[in-house]
Design a protein with these regions (language model features):
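Hydrophobic beta-sheet segments that form the core/acyl-binding groove
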Residues: 90-106
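Hot-dog-fold acyl-thioester-processing enzymes
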Residues: 2-90
Length: 106
């Protein structure tokens, strides 16, 4: 199904295979530092360049929940939740399939 612009969808209006395109957003070092301060998650894999360079991914990785928060914001900006969402209650069966690094655009 092709990407489309939509406004205010209810759950029963979503279709299997439906795609909603968002703007891109590049992850910055400031995003990671700010999220660490906000969340209290100062894990070295996110915040310590030297430590992260020796870890599995070879460089600092964005927090999974930071990426989820940015994705949520991008989704809101499309308008598909406009006037139809009361609360974000569940993200079911989501996986982080690959790391997101500083400079990556999602």
């Amino acid at each position: 199904m092709s990407a489309q612009k939509v406004r205010g969808l209810y759950f029963n209006q979503f279709e299997i295979g439906m795609q909603i395109t968002t703007q891109g957003r590049t992850i910055t070092e400031s995003d990671i530092v700010g999220f660490a301060g906000l969340s209290g998650d100062y894990n070295q894999i996110h915040t310590d360049k030297t430590y992260a360079s020796k870890a599995d991914f070879g460089k600092r990785v964005a927090h999974g929940l930071l990426v989820t928060s940015i994705v949520s914001g991008l989704a809101v900006q499309t308008g598909f939740m406009e006037g139809t969402v009361m609360a974000f209650r569940e993200i079911s069966q989501w996986k982080y399939s690959s790391p997101i690094f500083i400079g990556d655009t999602i």
